[in-house]
Amino acid sequence: MLSGQTVVSIQPVVGSPLDKTEFIVAMAVAAEQAGAKALRIEGVENVRHVSQATNVPIIGIVKRDLQDSPVRITPFVCDVDALATAGATIIAFDATDRQRPESRETIANAIKNSGCFAMADCSCFADGQWAAQIGVDIIGSTLSGYVGEIEPTEPDLELVKQFSSAGFFTMAEGRYNTPQLAAKAIENGAVAVTVGSAITRMEVVTHWFNSATQAVRQNNESISY
């Protein structure tokens, strides 16, 4: 069902006027009508309402900011249980080998026991290899570039290629902000591509356009003098 398809991640900028459940549901319905074959939704209540309004699989996550761990994505079994009850089809979790309140094995097993499919949000090939070995269903490149190093501007197509070559069900995710980059992910073996900011974060996209137009203006002004 997801082969060659686009998954839309709907996670508005925190504190944005669009960061309200009713707007998230509206964007989810619009994305489904436009052809999205799955949705990635953060927050239990958001998952609950989106699942009632749409008919495509939902990748559910809970994001937390913990004082004693850098892990943010679905760090607790209670998050898994709540997402499953709310209507998630797939539950994604941070699969990186970092300090965390509950082990990644514990989280993966909880997802399996919930009856949902599991998706590993990975930062490198070792993360994906670990996840595949314990039976995680979907291996994502979600966290490549987000685990301490300087954040790149381009997506990690090489990691997508490595996952695909290893036979993993590969979800390309992270910095796929143009249709051309999404197509390259499929060319490199991704089963599907998740796109977020370029579709659902108005503030981010507006900043991209402003930066581009202002750079030209500044360059022209410097030349004129």
From Swiss-Prot:
It catalyses: an N-acyl-D-glucosamine 6-phosphate = an N-acyl-D-mannosamine 6-phosphate. Its EC number is 5.1.3.9. Gene3D superfamilies: Aldolase class I. Pathway: Amino-sugar metabolism; N-acetylneuraminate degradation; D-fructose 6-phosphate from N-acetylneuraminate: step 3/5. It is an enzyme of class 5 (isomerase). GO terms for cellular component: cytosol. It comes from the Bacteria. GO terms for biological process: carbohydrate metabolic process; N-acetylmannosamine catabolic process; N-acetylneuraminate catabolic process. GO terms for molecular function: N-acylglucosamine-6-phosphate 2-epimerase activity. Pfam families: NanE. Keywords: Carbohydrate metabolism, Isomerase. Belongs to the NanE family. Converts N-acetylmannosamine-6-phosphate (ManNAc-6-P) to N-acetylglucosamine-6-phosphate (GlcNAc-6-P). PANTHER family: N-ACETYLMANNOSAMINE-6-PHOSPHATE 2-EPIMERASE-RELATED (PTHR36204:SF1). This is Putative N-acetylmannosamine-6-phosphate 2-epimerase. It comes from Vibrio vulnificus (strain YJ016). The lineage of its organism: Bacteria, Pseudomonadati, Pseudomonadota, Gammaproteobacteria, Vibrionales.
